[in-house]
Amino acid sequence: MKKIFIIIIFFISLNNFGQDEKVIKDLFDSGFTESKAYSWLDYLSNEIGGRLSGSYQAQLAVEWSKKELDKLNFDKVWLQPVMVPRWVRGPKEFALIETEPGITFNVPVAALGGSVATPSVGIKSNVVEVKSIDELKLLGKNKIDGKIVFFNRPMDPKFVTTFTAYGTAVDQRALGALEASKYGAIGVIVRSMTLRNDDFPHTGGLTYGALPISKRIPAAAISTNGADKLSGLLKIKPDLKFLLRQQCKQLPDAQSYNVIAEKKG
């Protein structure tokens, strides 16, 4: 009797799973074909614009999201208070390559989210190009100390799924400054995480982990065209110098909100 009961429960569970699976698929299908997702994304991206955590635009996005969700048939929509990091980019960043005194090439850069600033005059030093954190570790302090580390591993275009290509390259952006600081680097430049060849630096966040503030080094993304130029010039002039200036800063955490919509069932 016990075995029969277990078998009945098993088949009921399978049946419920099948129903749940169909409901979930229907929701996805509806979202792709009938929803306002693209118009919402357009408004969020182009009308509200950049939404760094703790910023005025981020608060506008919270208010707008709740307003839109209130129009839909949810049982409850509410705001959940949360404190978020508040980092500001400051004035436009500046960088140049100096192959020899008086001969320079400007390159597009942008500070990585969460990075510390350079001194007001910037940092200027020789460059060590690496393709991975493992390569950085192999070079060690003797070859890294006092220099700017240039992480230049491109995303792999052979991956059909772009996000897979991104995932296999983004460690150098997220962890590059943390790892390079261990070997005495004074700054980090990271190739932008994109398959495009252009002059627009693509930023993103980094982490310093538990590294004391006094040991944190500035980090910036360089455009893919800029990265190719720097790499090419390093082959000709290995002793060239790189100047980076950025004035970003970390402010106290700010109040923000998670926007939550609940549908009971």
Language-model features: locations:
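Noncatalytic luminal/extracellular "stalk/propeptide" segments of secretory-pathway proteins
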Residues: 42, 46-160
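A conserved hydrophobic secondary-structure block that centers on an alpha-helix together
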Residues: 131-197
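Sec-dependent N-terminal signal peptides
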Residues: 4-13
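Sec/Tat-exported extracytoplasmic proteins
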Residues: 31, 45-52, 65, 72-76, ...
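Extracytoplasmic/secreted proteins, especially bacterial periplasmic and envelope-associated proteins
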Residues: 26, 36-39, 43, 60, ...
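Soluble metallo-hydrolase cores and metallopeptidase-like ectodomains found primarily
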Residues: 21-23, 98-100, 106-141, 208-265
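N-terminal capping segment at the start of a domain
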Residues: 21-55, 200-204, 208
